[in-house]
Amino acid sequence: MSYRKLGRTSAQRKAMLRDLTTDLIINERIETTETRAKELRSVVEKMITLGKRGDLHARRQAAAYIRNEVANEENNQDALQKLFSDIATRYEERQGGYTRIMKLGPRRGDGAPMAIIELV
């Protein structure tokens, strides 16, 4: 299995990817470094595929990974509900390729290459 270490321990890396995945599901578009976006892409694609499956086991697998954060305050919807009700139905006929990565310029402080990752 191939992955990027991202300069962190495995627990820190997993926590960061969980946070970024939850943020991408809630906001549908985030700005991060290019390598984080490329690593995040595979995780988000798996979560959306779980959402498309839609059974109880898939919901529990996604709930074990996605943080319990409020996605929409007016109808009290959390990130997991948004994944299974809104995002999964949007990509029902699409077979993968749910995300798009657009490269930006370098970050001002350290020159790290930045990118925007968004749901298609």
Swiss-Prot record:
Pfam families (UniProt xref): Ribosomal_L17
GO cellular component, one term: cytosolic large ribosomal subunit
UniProt xrefs under InterPro entries: Ribosomal_bL17 (IPR000456), Ribosomal_bL17_CS (IPR047859), Ribosomal_bL17_sf (IPR036373)
Keywords: Ribonucleoprotein, Ribosomal protein
MF annotations from Gene Ontology: structural constituent of ribosome
Domain of life: Bacteria
Similarity comment: family membership: Belongs to the bacterial ribosomal protein bL17 family.
Subunit annotation: Part of the 50S ribosomal subunit. Contacts protein L32.
Name of this protein: Large ribosomal subunit protein bL17
Organism: Bacillus subtilis (strain 168)
Species classification: Bacteria, Bacillati, Bacillota, Bacilli, Bacillales
Gene name of the record: rplQ
